[in-house]
Amino acid sequence: MSLKNIVSLPEYKSTLPSGLVVRYRPFVVKEEKILLMAKESKDMEQIYSCIKNVIKNCIIEPENLDIDKLPYFDVQQLFIHLRCKSMGESVQIRVKDPETKQSFETELDLEKIKITNITKKLQKIKLNENIAVEFRYPSFSDFLKISNKTDDVGLETLLSVAGICVNKVFTKEETINCTELPHEEILEFINTLPKKEFEKFCEFFKSMPKISYNSSFKNPVTGKAFPVEVTDFTDFFIL
């Protein structure tokens, strides 16, 4: 018998925020090494690419699951589940006291991470009496494009997200399927909107689902507790 056939890995099942049920195994040493190398590179594109490849390796069902097409929050949740089953439910993070500016190391419980603002319905927003827009949430591949932007939630990023995620535009006369239109045409439409209507776009995208961890930490020097909030997915990419 081959040595590689001796090892038997456990299998787990999880229901993702979108409702998709997946069956998976924990990642193994070779995959942990891939993640460590990505972490050390500090290159976000490489990190996300490695996360995608590790998830793809570990998924048993559904077969041939296209990670790129999953909602980005499904991939985030799935990776956190994989991390829990593979290496334990806690990681060490550094937190900063906003009052004293001191940094401390503390333990983060991965099982307490929540994904907020989730709805499984496509979002429809009425811009004015004549126009409404239906959005979809960004897929993981969309999320990678967005994450490469450098202006956080600035105008360029909001335009990029909006252009990617506009699903349909409704007028009194017709319904326009934007998935069949060039990206540039959608951006041109968005750029012609009055400021008040564009702000409705901004509010939607700023309230998209996100991972969230809320706790508190007691400063051992002052004895005062301060809140700890983590919302950036990369903060959980700690092995």
Report each predicted region and the residues it spans.
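Short, surface-exposed, charged amphipathic helix/loop patches that serve as local interaction elements
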Residues: 1-239
